[in-house]
Amino acid sequence: MMRDAEERITRLEETVAHQLKTIEELSDQLAEQWKVVEQTRAKLDRLTERFLSLEEQAQDATPVTRPPHY
């Protein structure tokens, strides 16, 4: 009976060690993904600013009218 308890404790310790390793790996991956999200967000912000600037410039441009042959 004591041997069964020791084996059970050993299996539980192995399981906990495996879970700790998995949690650490997932945490590292999450941190890397967060960096990618932040970089993507920064790019989107820059593109949005550029788009709005170009849109504003286009509104200031001469309006397109029908050519005289229409």
Swiss-Prot record:
Q: Which InterPro entries match?
A: SlyX (IPR007236)
Which N-terminal residues, if any, form the signal peptide? none
For this chain, the family text in UniProt reads: Belongs to the SlyX family.
Q: Do you know which NCBIfam families this protein is assigned to?
A: PRK00736.1
Q: Would you tell me the protein name for this molecule? A: Protein SlyX homolog
Q: Which organism is it from?
A: Rhizobium meliloti (strain 1021) (Ensifer meliloti)
